[in-house]
Regions:
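Conserved core segment of the aminotransferase class I/II
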Residues: 98, 102-194
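Hydrophobic residues in well-ordered beta-strands that form the structural core
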Residues: 13, 73-75, 175, 255
Length: 298
C-alpha cells in the first residue's frame, strides 16, 4: 500500500474474516469487482496477522473470478507450508499446498526466504509468474515503458529493476541452493519452522488464562492454526491502547488497526520467544490481568 501511495494508485480493501467460505466470498468479491476497475488482488496465505488460511474452494473461486474479470492474483506465500495443521513437508508428495495457481493463469506467487529458511542475509524473494501471463503483451505497457509490452519483461526489466535495490550474487546462489536442497528432501524447512507453532500454543495458553481472547479464532469451521503470528484482544480495550499497555509490561506487538483489520486487538509474534521467557510472560500477564480487570467487566 505504501508503494501505491507513492505511485498515486488507488486501492480498496476488506477484512475477509466476515466473508469466509466460497459462497460468501463470491458475493463480496463480485461486489468489489463490479466497477471493472480492479487490476489485481493480493492476499497472504497463511494470513498476516490473523493466521487464517484460505481453503482450496476459496482459492478456486478467486482463480475463476481472476480469469473471468481479467485481474492478476498476487499470492503472498511468505509463510510457505507453515499451516502446521497439515503436513506439507514432503516434496513431490501429497498433500500439496493449496494455491490459486491451479485455477487460473493470471497469477504471481511470491516466495520469501526470511520466514521459511530464517535466512539471515540480505532479504530475497521470488516472483513465480505463470508462463501465459509472463508472455502476454499489453499495448499500455509498451506505450509507458517504451519496450515490447511483454508483461514479464516489463515487470522484471522496467519495473522491478527500478524500484528494488537488487541482491548480491552470493545471496541469490544461497537461496537457490536452499530451494534445491528442500526439493531433494535434504532440508526439511517445515519441520525446522514448526517451533513457531509450538511457541504460539504455549503463548496462547498463557494469554488466554489471563483474560485475553483470540480475535481471529476460527478458520471457516475449524480452530485457527498455531504459527508465526496470532491475534489477541483484551475485553473492551482498543487495539491501540492494548499495544501501548502491553509495552509497559515488556511485551511488544502491533495494533491490528495498522494491518487493514477492522477488529480491535493486536498481532503477537512468536519469532523471538525463548523457553526461559514463558514464566516471565505468565507472571507479567497475571499482573496485567489484575491491573486492567475493569476492561473484562461485562
Amino acid at each position: 500500500k505504501s508503494q501505491l501511495k507513492v505511485l498515486g494508485i488507488g486501492w480498496k480493501e476488506f477484512d475477509i474474516y466476515h466473508h469466509r467460505g466460497a459462497a460468501a466470498l463470491r458475493l463480496k468479491l463480485e461486489e468489489e469487482l463490479a466497477g471493472g476497475d480492479v487490476a489485481a488482488v493480493i492476499y497472504s496465505n497463511p494470513n498476516n496477522p490473523a493466521w487464517i488460511c484460505l481453503t482450496e474452494e476459496e482459492l478456486q473461486l478467486i482463480g475463476e473470478l481472476a480469469t473471468e474479470h481479467d485481474f492478476i492474483v498476487l499470492e503472498d506465500l511468505a509463510y510457505f507450508c507453515m499451516d502446521y495443521r497439515t503436513d506439507y513437508g514432503k516434496p513431490f508428495s501429497e498433500p500439496y499446498l493449496p494455491t490459486v495457481a491451479r485455477y487460473t493463469d493470471n497469477y504471481i506467487l511470491m516466495l520469501s526466504s526470511s520466514k521459511i529458511f530464517s535466512y539471515a542475509g540480505q532479504r530475497i524473494a521470488l516472483m513465480c509468474i505463470s508462463d501465459d501471463l509472463y508472455s502476454r503483451r499489453y499495448d499500455a505497457l509498451s506505450e509507458r515503458y517504451g519496450d515490447a509490452g511483454v508483461f514479464g519483461v516489463s515487470l522484471v526489466a522496467s519495473i522491478s529493476y527500478m524500484i528494488t535495490s537488487g541482491c548480491t550474487s552470493s545471496t541469490q546462489y544461497g537461496y537457490a541452493e536452499m530451494l534445491n536442497l528442500s526439493c531433494d528432501g535434504v532440508i526439511d524447512f517445515v519441520a525446522d519452522t514448526r517451533i513457531y507453532a509450538e511457541r504460539a500454543a504455549k503463548m496462547k495458553e498463557i494469554f488466554l488464562r489471563h483474560g485475553f481472547h483470540i480475535v481471529y479464532d476460527l478458520d471457516v469451521d475449524r480452530k485457527v492454526g498455531d504459527g508465526f503470528f496470532f491475534s489477541l484482544g483484551f475485553g473492551k480495550m482498543s487495539g491501540d491502547d492494548l499495544m501501548v499497555n502491553l509495552m509497559r509490561y515488556g511485551v511488544s506487538s502491533i495494533s491490528l488497526s495498522t494491518t487493514g483489520s477492522f477488529r480491535q486487538g493486536i498481532r503477537a509474534c512468536t519469532s523471538r520467544m525463548r523457553d526461559e521467557l514463558y514464566p516471565v510472560l505468565d507472571e507479567r500477564m497475571a499482573e496485567f490481568e489484575k491491573d486492567f480487570a475493569k476492561y473484562l467487566e461485562k
